[in-house]
């Protein structure tokens, strides 16, 4: 079974590209959603995060306050957050890939913002990164997540810059004018032989 790694900065359009590729029989694994599943109340991950970042990352009912966790995951704390969350996420992703393979799925899209940093790229046959200018990503994040400019900028600054993705990914998908996203996605289809 084909495993395609998908990465890029927040707001670049990874989800949009994955939706386009799902039409070709690929199963989409969203690492963010998998990560949210490891934040369950009472989980080892949530306990470790609370210890590392403080009790205020918990809501009064003991569930994860994702907005507070995102706020604490500034550039200097991203490594600490990732060292706690990534091992649990990787374990779940491996299980999903195994399950999809046993079901005879044509391939999976492993959509992970930290694909290379987490080492999850080692499960992939090839990788691609979606990129877009910071101004476009900033607008998209503010609209998508309903947050203010400062919060969106903190998220952007906590991530790798565009050159990181250009140096690590096999394919670069440009999700901004004058590039046509359908044409850009065809690059992935050619690599995948779909």
Report residues per predicted region.
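Hydrophobic anchor at the beta1->P-loop junction of P-loop NTPases
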Residues: 6
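P-loop (Walker A) phosphate-binding loop of NTP-binding proteins
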Residues: 9
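ATP-binding Walker
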Residues: 12
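Walker A/P-loop
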Residues: 15
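Post-Walker A helix-loop "phosphate-sensing" segment adjacent to the P-loop in P-loop NTPases
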Residues: 23-31, 43-44
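ATP-dependent small-molecule kinase phosphotransfer cores
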Residues: 36-105
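NTP-dependent small-molecule kinase module
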Residues: 95-107, 121-130, 134-147, 161-194
